[in-house]
Amino acid sequence: MAKVQYWGTGRRKEAVARVRLVPGEGNIIINNRSFEDFFPNQTSRLIVQQPLVLTAMQGRFDIICRVNGGGVSGQAGAIQLGIARALLKANPDIKAMLRRSGFLTRDPRMKERKKYGLHKARKAPQYSKR
């Protein structure tokens, strides 16, 4: 008999995370690497674990993630959203709690495109009056 597993997809900036929750003892594997190896800084680790801490499900599921694109912050945000969506499938009763804390909301902020005639998206060349 196959194990029960719950899927969730999260996106943030350019990062896309596919998250799988399997009943277990709380191990987190990201791109076949341990959680601590993948996110050496504490801030990213806290971001990823927030939905689990809020719902008190830290030791109930093993989390297996595939994440690509973006940088460290974007990947952490994408995994957070993926975990929240997968937890919602596992237990629909926690929807109000996750929604109130903002874990089910996709952050729409993206990098603004560079415009021609400018150095960056908004940085203009130095202006000389004379």
Curated annotation (Swiss-Prot):
GO terms for molecular function: RNA binding; structural constituent of ribosome. The keyword Secreted does not apply. PROSITE patterns: RIBOSOMAL_S9. Residues 111-130 have a biased composition (Basic residues). Keywords: Ribonucleoprotein, Ribosomal protein. Signal peptide: none annotated. GO terms for biological process: translation. One of its GO terms (cellular component) is cytosolic small ribosomal subunit. InterPro entries: Ribosomal_Su5_D2-typ_SF, Ribosomal_uS9, Ribosomal_uS9_bac/plastid, Ribosomal_uS9_CS, Ribsml_uS5_D2-typ_fold_subgr. It holds the Pfam family Ribosomal_S9. Residues 105-130 are annotated as: Disordered. Belongs to the universal ribosomal protein uS9 family. This is Small ribosomal subunit protein uS9. It comes from Syntrophomonas wolfei subsp. wolfei (strain DSM 2245B / Goettingen). The gene is rpsI.
